From Swiss-Prot:
It comes from the Eukaryota. Residues 193-266, 278-351 form the RRM domain. One of its GO terms (biological process) is positive regulation of meiotic nuclear division. This is Protein MEI2-like 5. The keyword RNA-binding applies. Probable RNA-binding protein that may play a role in growth regulation. InterPro entries: MEI2-like_RRM1, MEI2-like_RRM3, Mei2-like_Rrm_C, Nucleotide-bd_a/b_plait_sf, RBD_domain_sf, RRM_dom. It holds the Pfam family RRM_2. Residues 374-397 have a biased composition (Polar residues). Keywords: Repeat, RNA-binding. CDD domains: RRM1_MEI2_like, RRM2_MEI2_like, RRM3_MEI2_like. It comes from Oryza sativa subsp. japonica. Disulfide bonds: none annotated.
């Protein structure tokens, strides 16, 4: 017995006390302290709380308590005893394991108690809530892994459920504090010049990527160091090129992988020199300076995408260009220049800065209307998203009666007025106040337009929901687009200001004079309050005005994509008004100021005369909008028709336009090179020439403008150059000719005389010529600017426009 007692002491385990000490002590008390018991207790410990109370546990002897109280270095000291090669079997081990196995509850008994403790009603509710929360995943979306580099891909966004169901567009859930980002949610991805391309094969070559993305436009940079991680960054100069590339290449297979492309949002604190967004901020601007005047000044550097203001700060303006190179050129030329007697300061806008401030400002308002704004998304509008919400047509600082009208007259339903979507076109930016002469008349008279107008006597139904399709009255669209210019001008926000009016399809049907007069009198009575601008006059009577095909607008012919043109210029009388069709078939009155045309064609087109003929289903309007997409060849063709040269009409004298746009010019050509080519056959037939220059890259932008002295010269000019291949630089480009939007020498001079191009190198300025070969150079003074009438003789001597003698203009 003494030997066994000694052996027992040597085999007792020593361990550090822990919270499991009590459980282990109970097992040892039953089976006796042994190493086997300790090893076999792991299974029993899991169910120690389930052991019945019939087990009579004793107290450990005093020496065992000493072992428990004093920590040792080893759990099994017996294993270290010299000469011990095997464990000593304890006859009590088998007895302990057998009894414990019989006393433990079986599976049914164990799970029965667990199931009885559940509240089935609460469990079902939790499951339903979980399913609703997971609606994004159920709708076919995906979750993106958290990656610090990927956080720059998404802007701050807020998730929303559309009427309790998931949107059909892709949803992206991120966990960086920005919430859930919807692919085309108003708070989702904002159009950017940088594309974040995922799912890239690591073996793809850089040249292969460049050849894939470069056809859509000039690539600014390519970041391919992360190909091994499955993504790259492609940056364009022009945001339209990025948009077109994203639309065309989305899900395109590349080495058996479908590309996943998103817009990339710049970092929160970019460098002051980061011009990725192409937006400039003007400080200390005279509030009286209109957006039209700013457009004339900044439009000389490139196409302007948007001009917007900040609330309560009329002396600040944001000028956003499509092309960042134009923004850089404008910054260099106009910074610290004098505009309207004040020295202004230009700075690059912090990417998304103004946008974020408006998001915060309208956060609460958009939360309330979010379901309504998103319940009518159709298709994938990524290529057509304008940078402004369509639902906010007024100023953020003014009382917006338009939204109230949408909620009251239409009972909170979707309408062509309050809708922020037309056939799947979603929005990226919040509404930016952009008053091109903001009229207050709409705020006072909006309700009267749709309530009891004597001339609009036929019954027109308000929108009704039918299985997700909305019917609407044509009266609403036409009257709304007409009323938007009640006092002759209004704020151009949303698509009207950003995309302008496309002029590509005209409304030839004109109402009778009686109908026109009655309609204008009912909408715009004589006692209406007016706030006239010095650039505008009353619009009353403009509905009956005829279109003048002799004057076509904007400084360049339209691009292939119909959404790229913004503003129009022309040199006709300021009293001329137009009813034109917008890019989506929208009709809106157009007011003209000097050489500037602004338009309001944001709504589906309805002939003014046809407003008396009853309602038209909204499905037709949707079809019209869907038909005018980027990929629609018919729309592309229509956008070119009005600028195409028709030699038969020119010969017959029906088309008297004289200003041409020469396209597809190799970038290395200079003005002198181009003029030498022209003078080979047409010396002395033109009086204006201008080759726009990219000042950053020191090359031309690929097109030029020339004004022929007579329309008759266009026929021979077309025959000599159209389709001709350029001889120098081994270029594969061929000459393409089209009419320019600014027509006539006088309009061109008026457009460029106050341009900042006067501060650029003389070789980059527009040039005037005297086609009559006068012996001496003539100079004319226009608004304090001398313009040289260059001699055109056998020596080919030409003079650029001289520097501006008034140093206080743009110095």
């Amino acid at each position: 017995m003494e030997q066994r007692e000694d052996h027992t002491k040597s085999s007792e385990p020593a361990f550090i006390p822990s919270k499991r000490t009590h459980q282990m002590r109970n097992i040892w008390a039953w089976g006796g302290p042994s190493s086997t018991t300790v090893n076999g207790s792991s299974d029993a410990v899991l169910f120690s709380s389930s052991l019945p109370s019939v087990l009579q546990f004793g107290k450990l002897p005093g020496k065992e308590r000493e072992y428990n109280a004093q920590p040792k270095d080893d759990m099994f000291p017996m294993m270290k005893q010299p000469g011990t090669n095997a464990r000593v079997a304890d006859p009590m081990d088998d007895v302990a394991q057998h009894l414990i196995g019989n006393l433990l509850p079986d599976d049914e008994e164990l799970l029965a108690g667990v199931i009885e403790d559940f509240d089935h009603v609460k469990l079902r509710t939790q499951v339903e809530e979980s399913e609703e929360y997971d609606v994004f995943r159920n709708s076919g979306g995906m979750e993106l892994d958290i990656d610090p580099l990927e956080s720059i891909t998404f802007g701050t966004a807020k998730a929303s459920l559309v009427n309790g169901t998931g949107s059909s567009t892709n949803q992206y859930s991120i966990q960086n504090g920005a919430g859930t980002v919807t692919g085309e949610h108003p708070y989702g991805e904002h159009p950017s010049r940088t594309l974040f391309v995922r799912n890239i094969n690591s073996n793809v070559e850089d040249s292969e990527l460049r050849s894939l993305f470069e056809p859509f436009g000039d690539i600014r940079s390519m970041y391919t160091a992360t190909k091994h991680r499955g993504f790259v960054m492609i940056s364009y100069y022009d945001i339209r090129h990025a948009r077109n590339a994203k639309t065309a290449l989305q899900s395109k297979p590349l080495r058996r992988r479908k590309l996943d492309i998103h817009y990339s949002i710049p970092k929160e604190n970019p460098s002051d020199k980061d011009m990725n967004q192409g937006t400039l901020v003007i400080f200390n601007l005279e509030p009286a300076v209109s957006n039209e005047e700013l457009l004339q000044i900044f439009g000389a550097f490139g196409e302007v995408r948007e001009i917007r203001e900040t609330p309560h700060k009329r002396h600040h303006r944001f000028i956003e260009f499509y092309d960042v190179r134009a923004a850089e050129s404008a910054l260099r030329s106009l910074n610290k220049s004098d505009i309207a007697g004040k020295r202004v300061k230009l700075e690059p806008s912090r990417p998304g800065g103004a946008r974020r401030s408006f998001i915060q400002h309208f956060n609460h308002e958009f939360e309330q209307d979010e379901t309504k704004h998103n319940s009518f998304q159709i298709g994938s509008p990524s290529a057509n998203s304008p940078p402004s919400l369509w639902s906010q047509l007024g100023s953020p600082t003014d009382e917006n009666k338009l939204n109230a009208l949408n909620e009251t007259a239409f009972n909170g339903g979707m309408s062509p007025l309050g809708s922020n979507h037309l056939s799947g076109f979603s929005s990226g930016y919040p509404p930016m106040k952009s008053p091109v002469g903001k009229s207050s008349y709409w705020n006072n008279r909006a309700d009267n337009i749709f309530h009891g107008s004597p001339t609009l006597h036929n019954s027109h139904s308000f929108p009704e929901h039918h299985g997700g399709i909305i019917s609407a009255s044509p009266l609403v669209s036409s009257a709304a687009s007409s009323a938007s210019t009640a006092s002759g001008f209004t704020a151009l926000t949303g698509t009207s200001f950003l995309w302008g009016n496309n002029n590509n399809l005209r409304d030839h049907g004109q109402p009778s004079s009686i109908q026109s007069q009655a309609l204008s009198n009912s909408l715009f009575p004589n006692n209406q309050p007016q706030r006239q601008s010095n650039l505008y006059q009353n619009l009353r009577g403009s509905f009956g005005a005829s279109e003048h095909f002799s004057q076509f607008n904007v400084g360049s012919a339209p691009s292939v994509f119909p959404f790229e043109s913004n503003f129009g210029y022309f040199s006709d009388s300021p009293d001329t008004s137009y009813m034109r069709q917008g890019k989506f078939g929208g009709t809106g009155p157009t007011r003209v100021s000097g050489s500037l045309m602004t338009n309001f064609g944001a709504y589906p087109r309805i002939n003014v005369a046809s407003m008396q003929n009853g309602s038209v289903g909204f499905e037709g309007l949707l079809d019209r909008g869907r038909n005018q997409t980027v990929g629609n060849s018919g729309c592309q063709e229509d956008s070119r028709v009005q600028y195409q040269l028709d030699l038969e009409k020119i010969i017959a004298g029906k088309d008297t336009r004289t200003t041409l746009m020469i396209k597809n010019i190799p970038n290395k050509y200079t003005s002198n090179m181009l003029l030498e080519v022209i003078d080979e056959t047409h010396e002395g037939t033109y009086d204006f020439f201008y080759l726009p220059i990219d000042f950053k890259n020191k090359c031309n932008v690929g097109y030029a403008f020339i004004n022929m002295a007579s329309p008759g010269y266009i026929v021979s000019f077309f025959k000599a150059f159209a389709g001709r291949k350029w001889e120098k630089f081994n270029s594969e480009k061929v000459v393409s000719l089209a009419y320019a939007r600014i027509q006539g020498k006088a309009a061109l001079v008026n457009h460029f005389q106050n341009s900042s191009l006067m501060n650029e190198d003389k070789r980059c300025r527009p040039m005037l010529f005297d086609p009559k070969h006068t012996e001496n150079n003539n100079q004319i003074l226009l608004n304090g600017i001398f313009i040289s009438m260059a001699q055109q003789d056998a020596t080919q001597e030409r003079h650029d426009l001289p520097e501006n003698p008034r140093e206080d203009n743009f110095s």
